[in-house]
Amino acid sequence: MPTINQLIRKGRKKVKKKKTAPALQGSPQKRGVCTRVYTATPKKPNSALRKVARVRLTNGIEVTAYIPGIGHNLQEHSVVLVRGGRVKDLPGVRYHIVRGALDAAGVEGRKQGRSKYGVKKPK
């Protein structure tokens, strides 16, 4: 424990909060180009083939982003919009691709929770 004198001389060090999505550099979203689209397997208690993509952002940083929803139309060189938000059971995946924006189409046949998957209101 520091003495009062030591605190006057040095002061307390502020604890820096870790950024959740550093590659976005403070932006809400960033545009990027898919360099690889593939499936990944989740961590221990879960089992699936999660759809993910390596995306090179406009600032030059390459990140791994999750493709939400059932089915997608993304392939290499697709232009996508990337937002923050990790996938708990995929280590290293800290970003999501925004469905219904740029080249990523909305989820086909989606009726509920449509705004999260870029689906227009059915007629």
UniProtKB/Swiss-Prot annotation:
GO terms for biological process: translation. The modification 3-methylthioaspartic acid is found at residue 89. One of its GO terms (molecular function) is tRNA binding. Signal peptide: none annotated. Residues 10-20 have a biased composition (Basic residues). It holds the Pfam family Ribosom_S12_S23. Transmembrane segments: none annotated. Residues 10-32 are annotated as: Disordered. Keywords: Methylation, Ribonucleoprotein, Ribosomal protein, RNA-binding, rRNA-binding, tRNA-binding. It comes from the Bacteria. GO terms for cellular component: small ribosomal subunit. Belongs to the universal ribosomal protein uS12 family. With S4 and S5 plays an important role in translational accuracy. Interacts with and stabilizes bases of the 16S rRNA that are involved in tRNA selection in the A site and with the mRNA backbone. Located at the interface of the 30S and 50S subunits, it traverses the body of the 30S subunit contacting proteins on the other side and probably holding the rRNA structure together. The combined cluster of proteins S8, S12 and S17 appears to hold together the shoulder and platform of the 30S subunit. Part of the 30S ribosomal subunit. Contacts proteins S8 and S17. May interact with IF1 in the 30S initiation complex. This is Small ribosomal subunit protein uS12. It comes from Halothermothrix orenii (strain H 168 / OCM 544 / DSM 9562). The lineage of its organism: Bacteria, Bacillati, Bacillota, Clostridia, Halanaerobiales. The gene is rpsL.
